[in-house]
Curated annotation (Swiss-Prot), chain A:
It holds the Pfam family WD40. It comes from Aspergillus oryzae (strain ATCC 42149 / RIB 40). Keywords: Repeat, Transcription, Transcription regulation, Ubl conjugation pathway, WD repeat. This is Probable catabolite repression protein creC. Transmembrane segments: none annotated. GO terms for biological process: carbon catabolite repression of transcription. The keyword Cell membrane does not apply. PROSITE patterns: WD_REPEATS_2, WD_REPEATS_REGION. Belongs to the WD repeat creC family. The gene is creC. InterPro entries: WD40/YVTN_repeat-like_dom_sf, WD40_repeat_dom_sf, WD40_rpt, WD_repeat_creC_regulators. Interacts with creB. It comes from the Eukaryota. WD repeats lie at residues 226-266, 306-347, 348-387, 390-434, 506-543. Residues 36-61, 458-486, 541-572 are annotated as: Disordered.
From Swiss-Prot, chain B:
Residues 546-559 have a biased composition (Low complexity). Residues 253-269, 692-708 have a biased composition (Polar residues). InterPro entries: Papain-like_cys_pep_sf (IPR038765), Peptidase_C19 (IPR050164), Peptidase_C19_UCH (IPR001394), USP_CS (IPR018200), USP_dom (IPR028889). Residues 653-665, 733-754 have a biased composition (Basic residues). It comes from Aspergillus oryzae (strain ATCC 42149 / RIB 40) (Yellow koji mold). Its EC number is 3.4.19.12. Belongs to the peptidase C19 family. Residues 580-629 form a coiled coil. One of its GO terms (cellular component) is nucleus. This is Probable ubiquitin carboxyl-terminal hydrolase creB.
Amino acid sequence: MAQGPSCASELHYYRALDHANAGFATGTYHLKDDLHLATPPPHPSEAPVVNPNPLATVPTPPTSGVKLSLVSVGQRNKLPVFTSKEKVTAPPFADGNPALAAIPTKDGLKRRKPKNNIIKSSSSFVSRVITHEASSKRLNDRNPDGLFAFANINRAFQWLDLSSKNKEEPLAKILFTKAHMLTHDINELTKSSSHIDIAMGSSAGDIIWYEPISQKYARINKNGVVSNSPVTHIKWIPGSENMFMAAHANGQLVVYDKEKEDALFTPEISNHSAEAMKASSRLPLQVLKSVNSRNQKTNPVALWKLANQKISQFAFSPDQRHLAVVLEDGSLRVMDYLKEEVLDIFRSYYGGLICVCWSPDGKYIVTGGQDDLVTIWSFPERKIVARCQGHNSWVSTVAFDPWRCDERTYRFGSVGDDCRLLLWDFSVGMLHRPRAHQASARQRTSMIASNTQHFNRHRADSASNRMRSDSQRTADTYNDYDSAVRHPVEPRARTALLPPIMSKIVGDDPICWLGFQEDSIMTSSLEGHIRTWDRPREGINDSYNGNTSSPAISTSAAGSGSGIADSAMGSL
Amino acid sequence: MGSFLRSLRRDGPPTPSVGATPAKKEPPVPPVTPLEKMLQDMGAIREDGSDKFFGMENYGNTCYCNSILQCLYYSVPFREAVVNYPTRTPIESLEAALANTLRYQNFAANLEAEALAEKQKAANAQRPGAPPNQPQKPEDKDSPEYKKKMALQTLPLLETKNNATSYGMSESLFTSLKDLFESVVASQSRIGIIRPQHFLDVLRREHEMFRTAMHQDAHEFLNLLLNEVVANVEAEASKQPEPERSLPPAESADSTELSGSSGSKTPNTTRWVHELFEGTLTSETQCLTCEKVSQRDEVFLDLSVDLEQHSSVTSCLRKFSAEEMLCERNKFHCDNCGGLQEAEKRMKIKRLPRILALHLKRFKYTEDLQRLQKLFHRVVYPYHLRLFNTTDDAEDPDRLYELYAVVVHIGGGPYHGHYVAIIKTQDRGWLLFDDEMVEPVDKNYVRNFFGDRPGLACAYVLFYQETTLEAVMKEQEQENMDLNTSVADINDSTLKQNGYPLSPGLAHVHSASQIPSPSEPARFSNLQRAPTAPPLFPHPEHADSESSPADPSTTASATPPVPPIPDIHSLPLSPKKSDSHFKKERAKEEKERKANEKEKEKQRRRDQEARIREQRREDAEIRAALEASKASKAEEDRRHSPDDTKKSSHGLSRLKRGSKSFSHRLGKDKENRVSSSSHSATPIAEHPPSRNGASESQQQLPNGQSPGSHGLHTRHTGLDEERDTLKDPKHDRSGHHGKWRSFSLKKKSFSILS
């Protein structure tokens, strides 16, 4: 597929509906918007970014491309049609620890804001804050259902109103001195038109709790007092008003409480000898401070060490009980984070894993990594389902499209360093395994066994895997806690291969974030391009009619990607 | 021995307390380099050379050679093979030699420079962490130039001498490579600078294109070196049964041991380069008319992959194997339907090499500019790799590779610039080898050369070696552990216990002064492997130096007389290649000549144009230099082109072409588009059995080679023949346009320009 570097303004996809309907539904996403954030110049105190010596061995601080946190503070329910049928039954995190019982808020419903005003801050961490001169007017006039977007770029952090006419002008822009914000998240539970809780993690390890409407902030893990390595990913714990989880580049997962003060962290483990530390470092999870610890006056609430490797990303399951963590060492670790234990360890085909997400019903986990693959794992069956081949470089973000998922078929998307956006459809019945002598088979006819069979087999599988992991371990006293099942890497010949339904170059620079909205797909890139692609106006059940009604189609029908798209082209 | 004692000073703080160290010349101690700092906790020196970190002197644009040599040295199986083939020089004789060739610096002479350095250090210390933009022109202490200068002034210098006679071989590129490796392995200093002068002499003597002081292509050099090693080794093997062979039976015992313990398919001791670097590509061509699939195997020593902007090595490899349509001017001659037909072709890997050398084709010939351009595409490479493009029947198609070395090209174009190597060492992490300078670097540093960073530095050749998931996981556990925790200690103690690596001879000479802990030296004369290293290669350990009789040339080997150059080399060459080649050439000549000449004419015209275009380049200096070399090379080409088809007796030119065609065969010239018939028209039987194979079996049988392995042996002979027949197709090519064309063009213009 030779494709020019120029990005098209439409995305076409072809979708296999199901077996009954042999045809392919098609659709076109139109580029609605391309917002380009300016990269701020380096802070005067910073060393010049460009070192004249390309071989300079001084380590460069981590940075990341633009990532977005989107929030709508309106009342309208924008949830997709298809979500998990089962109610969230998991108890909230830290339920059993009275030391962490929620303190009844004295101010009633009023949210607590952080202490310090960021605009007047004299902190050496914050360089300056630029607010829009009419920001309060803009806030009052706007449609409450409109989207706010928070975006990091280099050392800047911007607050954008995507529903505004002049959305390129941020409502506020924070410039930090040296640290780059690498990740941020909005607390969905506490958001309102007068309050938004944002947690953001920086390359210095410091975490900022920021409330944009009042422009207040607080600094957590100040100067890395709890964990002094960069924050690679941050998420509010589902159902919690105050607690969020941060992944650090040193392999630690830390739960912080925005209301608590920092304290110098010392591991709370019984056997503290170096030898014991070393032995326990083989475990998939070292609880250096348990959520059940009585000592909860200060941060951290909990601190787990997963590995000596960078944690790339993690994701909470929709049932709020499990956590999928991906690491630079190529492992996907599925945790029961309420019980603080690792259940399963899967490995990438090769190379580090970069991103992870759950299907809306919690049945599947999807990862992307340095093997250029998107991999689907079945959570209940605890096994690999398929490898999705189509990216030409590393995969930076994967996300399900909950508006295009139902009980049988799932739609997800992925973006990567190849500047591409890929869309994938899969339904379990349609996956095929490559047959030994027909690797190029594009027919999607053969089927794999039904779910129940898999489930039975999985038991046997995991039992044998367990034995394998037992034999791997060195004889020491730490066996008792290591209940994690280590799954071997499945050979290529025994794993289903899934082609994308669409593959499209959407920019000139690596794409680092992807989000699905009800009416659009959004991507953001390394150099600050935020693109919005309108969904096809027709529903997913319309097929060809929708196409022909759109004048854009005929001009760029050839723009679609590889794999199944080719055969679809033939059928058109 | 005083010189050896003085080496202790270089070993850093843990050792200088050793009583024997004279306390002289301590004041002008140069600042501890990052490398020395890192090596402070090292235990005793190991015998396998894995803990030696030598820079290499640059004799003016020889960085292409230095970076490749370093990459090869740190391939454990390759180093061991070079050191052990045909036999390992007893350490005593090496030491005797080294006593003369390892030269420690006269610190007093460098006093002044160091004093200056100290002063500057003081000046710099006033502004710690200050950006290097201060206008302090004279000498930037962080600059590589300064570091190299300091290294040259302070580190021990290691010269190599031709030791070929002690290997029982005549001098060749292989023996001088072995000289280099053995010297470093046997050196009593852990760090230093090796001077590959002798190696370069041999290289330049035999290969005209390297004689200029011009910038050379590192990949091309790698390919040439590997081919040359193959040729040298095979040539020696074929002439070994000669009566005047001076080597005692110990050598043959060693070679049987080699074949026995290597445990791989071939008992042929000369095939170790093949076993490491060689893989097999299968090109499957399906005629779209009759749908018949024809297959053809080719061997490769490295893979050259085309690059795309914003892609990964994985993707480049997949593209490499992507289906290609042979149509229009590029049709496929189908045996089945007889005639040129449209066809679909794909290249897949049938046998995976144990070391995968990946050449990223950053220098691309652009039609509109008529010259090579460097591509600054961002191409990411993971630390681990598996190959997607294997055939269905490939053995171990999911083989896991780990990245162990990266050759980086720095510069804006193909005709100038600098090469460095970043290499993962056995247990000291990643190191940057920049000619004389060796510096430890962070693992993340390896990722600075995807091609998108300012500074023009891009990965150019990637070395992946096979590994296992278990080894990877074990290594990952060790990574990023605080070095001051128990891990380092444990490592150290294990090193001291079972890693006491000194062979008897070595131990009694130096142990008293060298080793801080006077523990009883363990008798491990076999090679050590670091515990973290994957079990890469069931490689033959070298014959016990106790059991093997003393080398006949222990002392003589130190400074053997340089043999008269041209004769010696042309003699030992195996006649196999030339003969079969010659015959084949003759047989094919008529058929090929037309196509061949047409192609050549075309190339020449293109080159001519390229040259004309080149003249317009702004860069006057480079242009001038280029012109000179181009002119000479073009002339040489013109001179040689008639030879190409007719003459094959002159040693030098034949050798050269052989390597070239080899390199063509090895993964570059992919397809025999029009000649499937001509190919099948040269059945294997037409070729006489390779003399190489025959002579080898002669050599092996007296040494107790079993008939069974002899059978295997002949199988390989057959394979050789097959490869010989495969050599031809390139001559059949006549101006098709395909994805491989740019490469052959590249090759062409490269040899013209360099």
